[in-house]
Design a protein with these regions (language model features):
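A short acidic, Gly/Pro-enriched loop at the edge of an enzyme's catalytic core
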Residues: 105-116
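Core SAM-dependent methyltransferase catalytic element
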Residues: 209-211, 217-231
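A short SAM/SAH-binding and catalytic strip from SAM-dependent methyltransferases
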Residues: 115-129
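A short glycine-rich, Lys/Arg-flanked "PGG" loop and its adjoining helix->strand segment in the class I
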Residues: 130-145
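N-terminal, positively charged/glycine-rich alpha-helical extensions of SAM-dependent methyltransferases
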Residues: 1-18, 167, 178
Length: 231
């Protein structure tokens, strides 16, 4: 898989118009509750500065901003950011949500800028996990927390087989038909099945200086929620 930022950015530019619709369809609307759980873990207080990585169309950032946080979203895709800003305007959240187009491995923020950070379904798109986590560590304040929501693979063999079959045969067809981009949804399958298992990802997180506060499978293990803290 080619995870160069330029390639990922162009892919998300192409699927941006149907991104929210397909998230709802392919997750059976479960992704909204999962995102809310990721936000709640951070216990955001009024005035906290929060970084949302791979902010996309703002589905994680906007509820956090609505809860009182001052959220900065970064994403490599301009088209995704334009949709996020449109939704922020509709929800009257532009005073609490701003965006930056850029690479999450080299962010234009000073050290210890943010009280907390979060990412939903974006960490698997990073082409260097160690460098990405080091960059998050840099921009977080001491004891700052980072919540990570990402797809995973169920441990139970039957459920795992069903889920992989869904990713292999159903997701690319539905995603391709609606978005017009079959390759993007084949990439989704490959990026999920090729991503480190939770125990391996926890090891990478610890290797970059984080303390793992929580690591929890969701919905039988098709997604996983992590909360880590800067020491």
């Amino acid at each position: 898989m080619d995870k160069r930022p330029s390639i990922i950015g162009r892919m998300f530019d192409r699927i941006a118009p149907t991104y929210d619709l397909l998230n709802t369809i392919l997750s059976f609307s479960l992704d909204k509750a999962w995102r809310r759980a990721a936000i709640n873990l951070l216990e955001i207080r009024a005035g906290d500065t929060v970084l949302d990585i791979a902010t996309g169309t703002g589905d994680l950032a906007l509820p956090a901003a609505d809860g009182g946080g001052k959220v900065v979203g970064i994403d490599i895709s301009r088209q995704m950011l334009l949709r996020a800003l449109g939704k922020a305007e509709e929800q009257d959240l532009l005073t609490r949500y701003s965006v930056v187009q850029g690479d999450a491995l080299s962010m234009p923020f000073r050290d210890e800028t943010f009280n907390s950070a979060m990412v939903a379904f974006g960490i698997r798109n990073m082409n260097n996990l160690e460098a990405f986590l080091a960059e998050i560590y840099r921009v977080l304040s001491i004891r700052g927390r980072f919540s990570v929501l990402e797809f995973s693979l169920p441990e139970r063999s039957l459920f795992r087989w069903i889920y992989v079959a869904y990713l292999t045969y159903v997701v690319p067809i539905i995603g391709g038909l609606i978005s017009g981009d079959y390759d993007a949804y084949r990439y989704l399958r490959d990026s999920v099945t090729g991503f480190p298992v939770p125990e391996a990802l926890e090891g990478i997180m610890k290797g970059q200086g984080f303390r793992v506060v929580l690591s929890m499978p969701i919905f039988g293990g098709i997604s996983h929620l992590y909360l880590i803290e800067k020491r």
